[in-house]
């Protein structure tokens, strides 16, 4: 049976990291939102009514990274050294990639994953009127494949 560091019987606790040494940390995460091709084209050409979708998603991801300990209960507050947010697209999707670096006692995977998640949710929010069908449903739109693609310690 695996050993869980945050769980002791029916008690949940934040792991004590005070004895760990500080080292450089980096995590890169990505995730994808699937959209209608017309929506991706509107994002590319800057014709979405709400404004610049990717600039807004980039700001949202950056804010989310910095707020991760307020969203995930047992996540440590750590000093963030840098955040980069990049986007790539296909005809029917946009992939967000968030890289977070820090110098500290614990990793930054949760921060990178939170940044990706909020970037993709922001894109959805900004284009939802274009994505809905005649019944107000989202038959094409979906968020998937959110994962850590790289982690460096030291």
Swiss-Prot record:
Among Pfam families, the record links this protein to:
MoaC
Q: Which SUPFAM superfamilies match?
A: Molybdenum cofactor biosynthesis protein C, MoaC
Query: Could you say which enzyme class this protein belongs to?
Result: lyase
Q: What is this protein called?
A: Probable cyclic pyranopterin monophosphate synthase
Record text on subunit structure and interactions: Homohexamer; trimer of dimers.
Q: Catalytic residues?
A: 125
Q: Which reaction does it catalyse?
A: (8S)-3',8-cyclo-7,8-dihydroguanosine 5'-triphosphate = cyclic pyranopterin phosphate + diphosphate
**Alphabetized CDD domains for the sequence:** MoaC_A
Instruction: Mention one GO molecular function.
Output: cyclic pyranopterin monophosphate synthase activity
Family, according to the entry, reads as follows:
Belongs to the MoaC family.
Q: Matching InterPro entries, A to Z?
A: Mo_CF_biosynth-C_arc, MoaC, MoaC_sf, Mopterin_CF_biosynth-C_dom
